[in-house]
Amino acid sequence: MARTQLVGTNGRIDFTLDGLTFRRTKSEAEARGVERLHDVRWAQIDGATVGSTSTGKPVVLVRVAAAPTDLAGRHDPHAVKLKRSMTDEATEFVALVNDEIATRRRWDEAAEA
């Protein structure tokens, strides 16, 4: 079964029916300018990728349509840094997110046709 939650070193991402929910500590949320519990709907998400920090730790990066793209990882409200051993889990989670986005886009296109 696919992983529907990732717990990182600076937050957590939950995969829900409505989109992704980012949970952060108070200080992490303030540093990113968001609430501690931050929801992003599927329609707002362009995709997700796995990146890495300069020290080699995996980072899940979620691209959101209306979000600025010039934020550094530590200030990006849609990025979660993980432990080094979690690269496989991050890759599976990103694949699940991207598959969900593609499925919803196909549904939207079929509904418009």
Please state what every model-predicted region is.
Residues 10-33:
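Short, compositionally biased strand/turn segments
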Residues 2-11, 33-113:
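Acidic, Ser/Thr- and proline-rich intrinsically disordered linker/docking segments
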